[in-house]
A protein has these predicted regions:
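Short, flexible active-site loop motifs that bind/organize anionic cofactors or intermediates
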Residues: 6-7, 37, 97, 173
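Canonical Radical SAM [4Fe-4S] cluster-binding loop centered on the CxxxCxxC motif
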Residues: 1-11
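Conserved AdoMet/S-adenosylmethionine-binding subsite of the radical SAM
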Residues: 17, 21-161, 166
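A C-terminal junction/extension of Radical SAM enzymes
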Residues: 180-202
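A short acidic, glycine-rich active-site loop
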Residues: 97-105, 172-184
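Peripheral (non-transmembrane) domains and long loops of multi-pass membrane proteins
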Residues: 166-172
């Protein structure tokens, strides 16, 4: 296996725009376009021209993000986004790397800015649940309360990235997959903190 094998395709803004508009009938019926990960906020300047072109057509835009990106990036895309899907990382602690403190502060700033300027009905919070955190739900719940998050979607972890890790020559850490019963217990614990939740199966 060539670890440097190119597994993506480069597109110009106009090429992407033309591809997206193939589904114009869906958008006319009330559908929209979602930008997701990687982390789209880290490509804010690159996707900005595309966001602008799409909004000129009156198409609804959503973004799925961890909010771990510079506040400047958030500010760039904010005027064009109608719905926000926030992939919370509270179950891991915080993303730790050489920019740990910067990323942590950026998350705080972005979340605060978003909550202050966007009606809550346009924000969806999600969190992946693995067996390893089932005894730490109280800690997670307190953090959710701290950030005024009263409704969250719980997603059981999966191993869909396993083959990609193998292709890249990296070690894949398999977290424990929670059962539906364990997810139900998790939801009950969150409810004790007045946090409503719903779970999805993969």
């Amino acid at each position: 296996m060539n670890f440097f094998e190119k597994t993506f395709h480069d597109y110009t803004i106009d090429e992407l725009y033309d591809i997206l508009l193939r589904d114009i009938s869906i958008y006319d019926a009330g559908g929209g376009i979602t930008f997701s990960g990687g982390e789209p906020l880290l490509q804010a300047t690159q996707i900005l021209p595309l966001l602008q072109k799409i909004k000129q057509k009156g198409i609804s835009l959503a973004i799925e993000t961890t909010l771990y990106a510079p506040i400047e990036n958030y500010t760039i895309v904010y005027p064009y986004i109608d719905f926000w899907i926030i992939d919370l990382k509270f179950q891991y602690g915080f993303i730790r790397n050489k920019d740990y403190n910067i990323n942590r502060m950026s998350f705080y700033m972005n979340l605060k800015a978003l909550q202050q300027s966007t009606d809550q009905q346009y924000i969806i919070y999600r969190m992946v649940v693995m067996s390893e955190i089932l005894d730490k739900i109280d800690i997670v719940a307190k953090k959710l309360c701290k950030y005024n998050i009263a409704l969250i979607e719980l997603l059981p972890c999966h191993s869909l990235a396993k083959n990609k890790y193998k292709e890249l020559g990296k070690t894949f850490h398999q977290f424990g997959l929670p059962t539906m019963e364990e997810l139900s217990i998790c939801k009950e614990q969150l409810l004790q903190y007045s946090i409503l939740s719903k779970s999805h199966s993969l």
